Swiss-Prot record:
Domain of life: Bacteria
Organism: Staphylococcus epidermidis (strain ATCC 12228 / FDA PCI 1200)
A biological process term (GO) from this entry: 'de novo' UMP biosynthetic process
Pfam families found in the cross-reference section: Pribosyltran
InterPro entries found in the cross-reference section: OPRT (IPR023031), Or_phspho_trans_dom (IPR004467), PRibTrfase_dom (IPR000836), PRTase-like (IPR029057)
Name of this chain's protein: Orotate phosphoribosyltransferase
Catalytic activity: orotidine 5'-phosphate + diphosphate = orotate + 5-phospho-alpha-D-ribose 1-diphosphate
Purpose: Catalyzes the transfer of a ribosyl phosphate group from 5-phosphoribose 1-diphosphate to orotate, leading to the formation of orotidine monophosphate (OMP).
Gene Ontology MF annotations: magnesium ion binding; orotate phosphoribosyltransferase activity
Keyword terms: Glycosyltransferase, Magnesium, Pyrimidine biosynthesis, Transferase
Entry similarity comment: Belongs to the purine/pyrimidine phosphoribosyltransferase family. PyrE subfamily.
Gene name linked to the record: pyrE
């Protein structure tokens, strides 16, 4: 499954590799990879494969889930597809509380005393995922873990999740993506080393 998802992300250009002309992330980090999984929303076949893959991860690792929770905003549609298929309640978590109305950070199903799985689109450092986890826990939820489409495989993410005692699982990862890109002739051996070095140095 990891290989198929990586191939799909490359084919629809949800993930772009540019070892010699680096992208600039919003954080200012210079990177040879850019991932925008929102592009998957425009491809029903890919979108459904992601939904079914994430459901498989949830059933394997978090079978006692009661609520599916999406991270705002990119995790929300995937959480909606999953909750619809599993016939489970859903909510979503903002990065911070609203400044008006009831000032809710969590919208949708009530999480108190419920087993919740968080759905992310992408894991880089893990910070946004854990922000959502902490908001849910403050609301009384029992967060079982996080599932996501893709991870860069940064050591910092592992540390972030381990510190919070939250397991996470992804459909595909950076190593698988590099392997698929190599097999399809999208990158050279020198490019591979550049990509690996970037990830290792950033970790």
């Amino acid at each position: 499954m990891a290989k198929n998802i990586a191939k799909a992300l490359l084919d629809i250009e949800a993930v772009s590799l540019s070892p010699n002309d680096l992208f600039t992330w919003s954080s200012g980090i210079k990177s040879p990879i850019y991932c925008d999984n929102r592009i998957t929303l425009g491809y029903p076949e890919v979108r459904n494969a992601i939904r079914d893959g994430l459901i498989q991860l949830i059933k394997e690792h978090f079978s006692n889930v009661e609520i599916i929770s999406g991270t705002a905003t990119a995790g929300i549609p995937h959480a909606a597809y999953i909750s619809e298929k599993l016939e489970l309640p859903m909510n979503y978590v903002r990065s911070k509380s609203k400044s008006h109305g009831k000032q809710n950070q969590i919208e949708g199903a009530k999480s108190e005393n419920k087993n919740v799985v968080v759905v992310e689109d992408l894991i880089s450092t893990g910070g946004s995922s854990i922000t959502a986890v902490e908001a849910l826990e403050e609301a009384g939820a029992n967060v079982l873990g996080v599932v996501a489409i893709f991870t860069y495989g940064l050591a910092k993410a592992d540390k972030t999740f381990n510190k919070a005692h939250i397991p996470f699982y992804t459909l595909s990862d950076y190593n698988e993506l590099i392997e698929v890109a190599k097999d399809e002739g999208k990158i050279s051996l020198n490019d591979i080393q550049t990509l690996v070095d970037w990830r290792d140095n950033l970790s």
